[in-house]
């Protein structure tokens, strides 16, 4: 019994150390970026020995890859913008585009870090960059599937590639809104979200007309 209790205690301390390391890394990454963050700084910020950081994570690249996955899991746990059948597509799309923009800064630091990694071609092949790109590919598939369900079947039959293009456009709109409003300038994020959503629905209605059907995104079923 005592042996089991001791084992459970070690596991709890190990998980707590890992959490502290990841939290410290996220804080430093928000301040200094990937290149400016060092393992020694992470150890100091977390209050743990450098050896403890290396025990959990082989190197900085793998540490950042684990950070991105951990942060994504936490962020997704707070999201409810996909596949809620009681809400019309118009409301779901609005949440998809504006979700990151209206969250607290600490909740979206990993998106900022991920975008910086994606833009940094010198890091091509690194575990952290590849992790974020895989996250984006997975999210693109998820949103493409959402569009596949939201669109009338006549539209997808008429243009099978339309859901994927809409998913790419949706992600581009969300990225652009997030980057623009994160720059610290006085941009009206709410108004811009509405304009982006209206633009996308205009494209959808045009595609529906070409397919010979009518479509209303404010209805849960069409």
Give the ranges of each region predicted by the language model.
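Generic hydrophobic, amphipathic alpha-helix propensity
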Residues: 14-25, 42, 67-75, 143
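Short Lys/Arg-rich basic patches
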Residues: 6-11
């Amino acid at each position: 019994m005592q042996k089991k209790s001791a084992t459970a205690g070690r596991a709890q301390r190990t998980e707590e150390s890992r959490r502290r390391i990841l939290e410290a890394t996220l804080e430093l990454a928000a301040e200094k970026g990937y290149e400016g963050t060092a393992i020694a700084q992470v150890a100091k910020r977390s209050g743990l020995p450098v050896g403890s950081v290396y025990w959990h994570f082989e190197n900085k690249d793998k540490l950042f890859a684990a950070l991105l996955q951990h942060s994504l899991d936490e962020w997704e746990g707070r999201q409810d913008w996909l596949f809620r059948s009681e809400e019309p597509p118009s409301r779901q799309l609005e949440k998809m585009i504006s979700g990151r923009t209206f969250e607290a800064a600490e909740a979206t630091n990993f998106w900022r870090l991920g975008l910086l990694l994606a833009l940094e071609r010198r890091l091509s092949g690194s575990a952290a960059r590849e992790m974020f790109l895989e996250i984006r590919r997975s999210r693109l598939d998820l949103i493409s599937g959402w569009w596949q369900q939201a669109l009338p079947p006549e539209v997808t039959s008429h243009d099978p590639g339309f859901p994927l293009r809409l998913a790419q456009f949706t992600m581009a709109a969300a990225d652009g809104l997030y980057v623009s409003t994160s720059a610290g300038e006085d941009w009206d994020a709410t108004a811009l979200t509405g304009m982006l959503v209206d633009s996308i629905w205009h494209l959808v209605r045009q595609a529906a007309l070409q397919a010979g059907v009518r479509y209303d995104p404010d209805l849960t079923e069409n």
